[in-house]
Every structure is written in C-alpha cells, then in structure tokens.
C-alpha cells in the first residue's frame, strides 16, 4: 500500500538538509547516505547520491523519472552469481 497523500513523502532529515545545502550553494557534489528508505523528491534532481548497499556506496544520478521512488531501489543489496551448470556427462555411469 502506498503512503497516504496527506502525509507527503518521507525523506530523512539529515539527507534533506544535505540536499538543501547543495541547492543553496549551487554545487553538485556527491552526497553520501545510508538512508535507503528516503523517497526521491524533485529537490534532488540532478544530484548524485551515493546510496549504501551494505558494503559500499553506489552512486545514483537522480533523474526526473526516479521521482517518487525510494533510494534503495537503485542500489541492489544482493549479488546473483548465477546457477552452476550441470555436468551431464559426469552423471551417466
């Protein structure tokens, strides 16, 4: 279920302050954050936000189509290495 419209989008306060500071300065430095639960708002457009995936920070460049999604959607936490291929010749004896 989506969040109620009367509540508005959730953005961690420390992340919101960092984005507002960058907007006031007019700079586009990489903003490092651990807040995967924060929603992308229009103020973040054009910024690169480094989202933590549990090991490292993955840089995410925010575009217009990302507004309304969560930051964590763009930094996958699991690495799928693929299934092991069966060795059919070894099993036939």
From Swiss-Prot:
GO cellular component, one term: small ribosomal subunit
Classification via Gene3D superfamilies: 30s Ribosomal Protein S19, Chain A
Superkingdom as given in the UniProt entry: Bacteria
Sample GO molecular function, one term: rRNA binding
Xref: Pfam families: Ribosomal_S19 (PF00203)
GO biological processes: ribosomal small subunit assembly; translation
Presence of keyword rRNA-binding: yes
Keywords: Ribonucleoprotein, Ribosomal protein, RNA-binding, rRNA-binding
Coiled-coil zones: none
Family: Belongs to the universal ribosomal protein uS19 family.
Classification via NCBIfam families: rpsS_bact
Task performed by this protein: Protein S19 forms a complex with S13 that binds strongly to the 16S ribosomal RNA.
The protein, known as: Small ribosomal subunit protein uS19
Organism: Paenarthrobacter aurescens (strain TC1)
């Amino acid at each position: 279920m989506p969040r109620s419209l009367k509540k508005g989008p959730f953005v961690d306060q420390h992340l919101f302050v960092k984005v507002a500071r960058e907007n006031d300065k007019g700079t586009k430095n990489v903003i490092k954050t651990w807040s995967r639960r924060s929603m992308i708002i229009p103020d973040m457009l054009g910024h690169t936000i480094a989202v933590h995936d549990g090991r490292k920070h993955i840089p995410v460049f925010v575009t217009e189509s990302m507004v309304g999604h969560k930051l964590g959607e763009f930094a996958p936490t699991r690495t799928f290495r693929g299934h092991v291929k069966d060795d059919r010749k070894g099993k036939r004896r």
